Amino acid sequence: GEFMVGSSNAFVVRPFGFHLDVPGNPGAADASGSVFTTAGKPFTASLSAVVWEAGDDSDADGLPDANGDLADNALAPNFGQETIPEEATLTHTLVAPTGGDPGSLDGTSFAGFSSGECSMSDVSWDEVGIVSLRAALKDHDFLGSGQDVQGLLPHVGRFIPARFSVNSNIPEFDHACSGFT
């Protein structure tokens, strides 16, 4: 065979996706699932920029499949070491209860990747139920290429109430008798 000999400029390859991990998350799919934590309590979420594997991209679109398991993909260790380092954010979608309050997700900015990984210990969700978490580049544009890097964790929870508020209810009675004749 023939070989190409020479050199080229340095090049960068976009990570295939983010593996998103929430330690201790039982991944409950409904109200009968195991409890993860209480509403509003901080938890840890970790993002790992990973490389492509055929089994996670069945439609060959360059993005992880919705059911893709990126946990075993190799790391993209240089992610986050760009001249202007890329950053990622988390968003959430309410999975259960249907019609529930989607609440607010805090601690969603991931910056300072090291060896392709970043972990935040102050992520919190202020409601009860189950959410899905989606990771994406903060600007949705890897190094000006127009391409995003994404990851999905379909079930995080079950989150339960942190406390209940009890108010006293002292009834007042109206006069019950009508006038006499």
Where are these regions (language model features)?
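Core sequence-specific DNA-binding domains of diverse transcription factors
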Residues: 1-181
